Amino acid sequence: MSRYTGSTWKISRRLNYSITETGKELRKRAYAPGQHGQRRAKISDYGLQLKEKQKLRFTYGMSEKQFRKTFERASKLKGIHGEMFLVLLESRLDNIVYRLGFAKTRAQARQLVNHGHVLVEGKKVDIASYSLKPGQTITLREKSKNLKIVEEVLKNKFVRADYVSLDKQLNGKYVRYPKRNEFLAEINEQLIVEFYNR
């Protein structure tokens, strides 16, 4: 299954969960899109697990194949499987570019990475799924700071997490791995573990 490129607002409304983490999608119409969107059928255990998996997958904008691969990688790490999975997702380069405030959305952050605008430890990395380690620095190429979309977001200098830092020269740093209570509080990762372990 390829990465979804359609309307994030429709997906958010279908899942009754803001995949952009802003909540804007649900303010106007907090029900699924379409003619029968306001009906909420009773959901099975499998349906709950699937929905939770989709909420997380769409939040990070990943294909099913990538998502599953990351889940399997997390099973080999020390710690609680579900939590390790979330930490791996949160450590992706495109996500940290978003958390640093270099982009308005994860999709925009992924585009910046894919087009070669992002440097890790001073070297160009154009793989959105690149897994960062604490202590690594993340910056934009000098020329890239003049891009209109970048200039717009940098005016606000909005850092979206305590486990990343940004100085006045726009040098970002992945300070440490996040604690579970610091991000995506609405996600129940245990349901996702149950979904894949069926």
Curated annotation (Swiss-Prot):
GO cellular component labels: small ribosomal subunit
Domain of life: Bacteria
Keywords of this entry: Ribonucleoprotein, Ribosomal protein, RNA-binding, rRNA-binding
Pfam families in alphabetical order: Ribosomal_S4 (PF00163), S4 (PF01479)
GO MF annotation, one: rRNA binding
Function: One of the primary rRNA binding proteins, it binds directly to 16S rRNA where it nucleates assembly of the body of the 30S subunit. With S5 and S12 plays an important role in translational accuracy.
Subunit structure, interactors included: Part of the 30S ribosomal subunit. Contacts protein S5. The interaction surface between S4 and S5 is involved in control of translational fidelity.
Family, similarity comment: Belongs to the universal ribosomal protein uS4 family.
Protein name listed in UniProt: Small ribosomal subunit protein uS4
